[in-house]
Regions:
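N-terminal beta-hairpin/loop module of FHA
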Residues: 31-60
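Forkhead-associated
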Residues: 49-100
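Broad, structure-driven detector of short, well-ordered beta-strand segments within folded domains
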Residues: 60-68, 113-119, 194-198
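Surface-exposed beta-loop interaction hotspot
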Residues: 109-181, 188
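Acidic/His-leaning functional-site neighborhoods
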Residues: 184-232, 242
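Extended, aromatic/histidine-rich regions of cofactor-dependent oxidoreductases associated
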Residues: 5-7, 215, 236-238, 242-278
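Protease-labile, long low-complexity intrinsically disordered regions enriched in Pro/Ser/Thr
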Residues: 78-124, 131
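Actinobacteria-biased recognition of intrinsically disordered, low-complexity terminal regions
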Residues: 1-21, 28, 278
Length: 278
């Protein structure tokens, strides 16, 4: 194993052309996902609801937050359609929605617009998704550091005896998120051991949400995320920091992203992965 120019120990020597080709395909898919008609770039507003029924920006009907959930009052002429796993239903009268805290919201369609009804901590809000939002129509791509095999690293996963529900802050003051921490991931950079709390992902995968010395300089201040496949039987992992991504809040002020877990700040500059959007 060779020592990298900055002291990073790569997992193996890989042909940079292969690494670049794989990354190019991944990055193109990532940008395409961001730019879908109702993706993160389409957010146009974030409106916090009160118990008083009131109009919402851009869509008809009256909306309010109650202890039971979000109440919508509308007529068929208002053309509000609630998406459902079974079949869409048009609002005719009063409907109560029950979004889950910290999860993707319930979607209500109005023509080309989509209202995402979300719950965050003890509050409810509406996120308006508009394909014509300036953040989407002016999108030209996500800047990133040059691909470098030095940032493909060996790591080890040490699972906790039991998963832990932890509290982290949010980019919106006063909100909290409650992800599940499942263990620690350790690796070495510049000869120094680095440790990150790993959050649960789907099907045993891990999510590493961290800050580093680039945060607030060339990358988003609130940190970035690396998604990792499920560890091997002995806890072995490969971390490809070239695939570190921004959270949605790096692209829009209307997201409510979590902040990294306490202690998830690396002592090095991870000059790999996505940079701060222009």
């Amino acid at each position: 194993m060779e020592r990298g120019r900055q002291g990073v120990v790569p997992v193996m020597t890989r042909a940079l052309t292969d690494l670049q080709t794989e990354w190019d395909a991944w990055h193109s898919a990532r940008e395409a996902e961001l730019a879908t008609p109702h993706g993160w770039l389409s957010l146009r507003s974030l409106q916090w609801l009160t118990p008083e029924p009131s109009a919402a920006e851009g869509v008809p009907g009256l909306w309010s937050a109650t202890p039971d959930g979000v109440v919508i009052t509308a007529t068929p002429a208002d053309d509000l359609v609630v998406r459902s796993v079974r079949e869409p239903r048009r609002v005719d009268g009063t409907v109560t929605l029950h979004p889950v805290d910290g999860k993707p919201g319930t979607l209500v369609e109005h023509g080309d617009l989509v209202v995402e009804v979300v719950r965050r901590t003890d509050s409810h809000a509406l996120r308006l998704r508009d394909p014509a939002a300036a953040t989407r129509t002016a999108f030209t791509g996500v800047p990133a550091f040059p691909v470098d095999e030095r940032w493909v690293l060996e790591a080890a996963f040490q699972p906790y005896v039991e998963p832990r529900r932890i509290a982290v802050g949010a980019v919106v003051e006063g909100l909290s998120h409650f992800p599940t921490a499942v263990g620690d991931v350790t690796f070495r950079v510049d000869g120094q051991e680095q440790r990150l709390v790993a959050l649960a992902g789907p099907d045993g995968a891990l999510s590493l949400h961290f800050r580093d010395a680039t945060s607030g300089v060339s990358t988003y201040p609130g940190g970035r995320i690396l998604k990792v496949e499920a560890p091997g039987p002995d806890g072995e992992l490969t971390l490809d920091f070239n695939r570190v991504v921004n959270l949605p809040c790096a692209f829009t002020e209307f997201a409510t992203c979590p902040l990294p877990p306490a202690g998830n700040t690396l002592t090095v500059a991870v000059e790999a992965g996505e940079q701060l959007p222009a």
